[in-house]
């Protein structure tokens, strides 16, 4: 199978980039699919997550939208960026001729309905839709996508118009390590202090863990 992953900026050091690299490597190494990762934005930074040598990484070199306080100019800049990204993406997709195209992040949601291909178009939601400031623009993607993949069942409920919605949690490739010494009663959690990270739930869960150890 010929698989394409579309991501905003593969040079970013984030969770989406990490999971895309893991999936791409797994599809290629374990299932022997042909895999291409397409990075939309122009970014000269070194990529943080290594792809197998057999996986193609294509940069479309689309410049970022201009940052300005002028709302009209900002909107026009974003529209131009989107149209340029759609043009270059369609040109690249035509050359690759994939069987399935996975779209990620906000830009991916906007590009999916603009991508003209016979391949299956699947949107991977890596963020709860309600937390995305541009979620109101997801309607067209929702109707055009052959499927939407979410991380949780609660996330899946937010895509009522989609033809098919699947829940596939992110996998972890870090070996399980058992704690041998429970004498240390201190624990740390690292992450952005935002509602979507669920630190409130983590604190609640830790109460039960503390009782056991």
What are these regions (language model features)?
Residues 93, 121-146:
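A conserved, positively charged/aromatic
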Residues 82-85, 103-109:
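Short His-centered aromatic/hydrophobic patch
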Residues 4-6, 180-197, 203-207:
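Conserved donor-binding/catalytic core segment of Leloir-type glycosyltransferases
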Residues 32-34, 199, 203-213:
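A conserved nucleotide-sugar
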Residues 5-13, 26-76:
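N-terminal strand-loop element at the rim of the active site
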């Amino acid at each position: 199978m010929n698989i394409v992953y579309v991501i905003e900026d593969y040079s970013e050091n984030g969770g989406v980039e990490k999971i895309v690299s893991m999936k791409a490597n797994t599809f290629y190494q374990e299932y022997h699919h042909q895999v291409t990762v397409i990075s939309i934005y122009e970014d000269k930074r070194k990529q943080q997550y290594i792809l197998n040598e057999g996986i193609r990484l294509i940069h479309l070199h689309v410049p970022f939208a201009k940052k300005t306080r002028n709302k009209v100019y900002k909107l026009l800049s974003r529209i131009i960026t989107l149209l340029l990204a759609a043009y270059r993406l369609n040109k690249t997709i035509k050359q690759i001729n994939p069987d399935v195209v996975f779209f990620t992040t906000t830009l991916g949601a906007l590009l999916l309905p603009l991508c003209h291909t016979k391949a299956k178009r699947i949107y991977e939601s890596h963020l709860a839709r309600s937390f995305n400031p541009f979620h109101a623009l997801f309607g067209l993607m929702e109707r055009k996508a052959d499927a939407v993949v979410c991380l949780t069942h609660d996330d899946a409920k937010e895509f009522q118009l989609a033809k098919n919605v699947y829940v596939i949690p992110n996998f972890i490739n870090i070996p399980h390590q058992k704690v041998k010494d429970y004498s240390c009663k201190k624990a740390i959690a690292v992450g952005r202090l935002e509602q979507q990270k669920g630190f409130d739930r983590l604190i609640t869960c830790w109460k039960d863990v503390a009782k056991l150890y």
